Amino acid sequence: AYGGLGQGLRTAVAALDAVGQRCASTGMVYLMHLCGVACYAAQPEGVEEPLRDAAAGRHLSTLAWSERGSRSHFWAPISQARATAEGVSVSADKSWVTSAGHADGYVISARSPESSGPTDTMLYYVPKGAAGMSVAGPWQSMGMRGNASSPMALSDVAIPAARALSAPGGGFPRMMEILPWFALGNAGISTGIAEAAVQGTTAHLTGQGFAYTGSKLADLPNLRERLARMRVATDKSRAHLSMVLDKVEAGAPDAMLAVLSSKPSASGAAMEVTDLA
């Protein structure tokens, strides 16, 4: 109804693996875009135009969930929406937002106007340039500096009721629906980073050598052993990721536990492999 190729999570992870092999920052931008669009698709009534634009490649989305007071516990925002005649007004300090200032649409989280607890939340769509929303600082990371994950500030941002992306109080379950996309996509990028390190190291060892003997670096057994460890760690990471996808697609009872294991497994492999490179 809205365009796109109709592919699912496994294809998205494979695409993120491929992008991660070339540019991890671009991979993160693409991942957060996919997560944002997944939120649109889950409740499309008020976001039909951006959903069609995203399918046509004219709209970049992202998530604005993490806050200074809740840090990595993105599912428990500190900010609370205030009911207005037209919808809600939201003020929040979002600690990092990938593609901040560049994305065309932002999926923001806040506690419901009548919230009874930290997980009584809502998700909303906010377009780029909305009054009261701004980038609050630079992105100064040690790595992946190209994804512009800057903090953003929302000051009395007016959001019409039609732009709600969850049922009343339904933000938390919607976030849990998006979590597999985020965690497995992140794992795909990390696996891509590891694969790129293996390929780059292989090219270096087979392409460089010693002029006086004519031998290659790959002829040295200690370097071949390091490369073998890199290859094994990368293959294990990809195999684990495939196993998790199998569980998700089969609706296995431990699927969510497997999803949560995917990110540390793949990121750990990426660190191991790049350290060996």
Can you annotate each of these PLM segments?
Residues 15, 36, 90-92, 124, ...:
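Buried hydrophobic positions in well-ordered alpha/beta secondary-structure cores of metabolic enzymes
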Residues 199-204, 237-243, 271-272:
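Extended, amphipathic, non-transmembrane alpha-helical segments
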Residues 2-98:
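Glycine-rich flavin
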Residues 46-47, 216, 223, 251-258:
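Residue-level recognition of alpha-helical structural elements
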Residues 93-134:
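A short core secondary-structure module
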Residues 141-233:
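Glycine-rich beta->alpha junctions and the first turn(s) of the following alpha-helix
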Residues 235-265:
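C-terminal helix-coil-helix/basic helical segment that borders enzyme active sites and/or dimer interfaces
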Residues 253, 264-277:
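Alpha-helix capping/hinge segments and adjacent helical runs
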